[in-house]
UniProtKB/Swiss-Prot annotation:
Reactions this protein catalyses: (2R,3S)-3-isopropylmalate = (2S)-2-isopropylmalate
InterPro entries in the record: 3-IsopropMal_deHydase_ssu (IPR004431), Aconitase/3IPM_dehydase_swvl (IPR015928), AconitaseA/IPMdHydase_ssu_swvl (IPR000573), IPMI_Swivel (IPR033940), LeuD (IPR050075)
Sequence similarity: Belongs to the LeuD family. LeuD type 1 subfamily.
Gene Ontology biological-process annotations: L-leucine biosynthetic process
Pathway(s) of this molecule: Amino-acid biosynthesis; L-leucine biosynthesis; L-leucine from 3-methyl-2-oxobutanoate: step 2/4
Organism of provenance: Bacillus cereus (strain B4264)
Name of protein: 3-isopropylmalate dehydratase small subunit
Amino acid sequence: MEPFRIHKGTAAVLMNDNIDTDQIIPKQYLKRIERTGFGKFLFDEWRYDNNRQENPNFPLNAQERKGASILITGDNFGCGSSREHAPWALADYGFRVIIAGGFADIFYMNCMKNGMLPIVMDKDMREQLAKTDAREQITVDLENEIMTTNTHRFHFTIEKMWKEKLLNGLDEISITMQYEQEIKEYERKVALH
């Protein structure tokens, strides 16, 4: 996993509350276990019409929002079933930061495990941030827990454990590998033959 220290990017805004994992990525696209290739199905039922043409009224389809790497959204994002495909789709689409009023617990952890930073922010701050010009770069500084635009500065908090994992690019496997020697020593001690 790539370390996450400072991220600069533009934002897309989807201020709906209670966006569940079925809306993030519909069930018909969950037949694969690879982590890539899901971005094209992100918010599929909202992004496309019945003829697979882009819905011009969906915020992520606005030309000025294409390429956004920060998603500003409503409360209780990622609720519903706990499929990891939802964070895979968001990451594959290009999002690195998700800002919401709150997250479903398992979805929140899955974001972190996949190198994305989920930030909990109150509605007034999100609405202020959502007014940022579509072309303006927003800077997210994880180490100092600060987000800045050309005109505003926002503070956010994150649990120390998750912060350290993201800053150092550590996933569960790389953390386990830090103890490889201890694991081998233990296996030698308890070997049955």
